[in-house]
Amino acid sequence: MAGGIRKKTSLRDKSSRKSGLASKISEFKQQSTIENGQDEHFHENPLLKLSKISKKEKQQQKTDTFNQKLLHKVTFNTSSNISKSAVRRRKRKEKEQLKPKMDELLTSLPDDMFAPTAASTTTIRRATKTGEATSGYVKSTKANLNLPNANKATGHKQILKQENKNFTNVLKNPEFRQSPFSALKNAIKENLQG
């Protein structure tokens, strides 16, 4: 029966703590008024500490300590003293190893597939000035036009200038006054072909 009954001392403890706190506050006020003579930095609640450092100074201290920690801990070559180019080379090798190799593909295909026949083989011969045919390389059909690169800013500007000139030429064209859409269509076709 003694274990089932509890004393209600928690409320008394709270009230005694509050009264003790109030008495400490009043004592602190009296001491501070006597010592400082009601100084400007006096605050009603003695439990709140007046900050001696401004907010900007605190932030500056935090950033300084953080930067110092970074300088001591981090080096820019964190990958166990391997240069960036070496890491790139390794990655490139790994990618190349993943790609299928043509030799392996050729060995896996049947041999009779690649046997040369007279009908399938053709040799390219170029006629010379003297009239005799010699085997040589096929000339590239792609012409080097030295076109501006649209991906770069300077090339983009050049393309815009060219297009503006083309558009003004289309507007000056007498066909444009008769039928604007057909003139634009023809100009676009010419631009794509040339």
Curated annotation (Swiss-Prot):
Any GO BP annotation: maturation of SSU-rRNA from tricistronic rRNA transcript (SSU-rRNA, 5.8S rRNA, LSU-rRNA)
Subunit structure, as described in the record: Interacts with the 35S, 23S and 20S pre-rRNAs and with the U3 snoRNA.
Source organism of the structure: Scheffersomyces stipitis (strain ATCC 58785 / CBS 6054 / NBRC 10063 / NRRL Y-11545) (Yeast)
GO CC terms, sorted: 90S preribosome; nucleolus; preribosome, small subunit precursor
Protein's recorded name: Ribosome biogenesis protein SLX9
Subcellular localization, as worded in the UniProt entry: Nucleus, Nucleolus
Protein purpose: Involved in ribosome biogenesis. Required for normal pre-rRNA processing in internal transcribed spacer 1 (ITS1). May be involved in the movements of the replication forks.
Alphabetized InterPro entries for the sequence: Slx9-like
Transmembrane segments: none
Ranges for region Disordered: 1-45
Pfam families in UniProt: SLX9
Source species, domain of life: Eukaryota
Entry keyword set: Nucleus, Ribosome biogenesis, rRNA processing
Similarity field: Belongs to the SLX9 family.
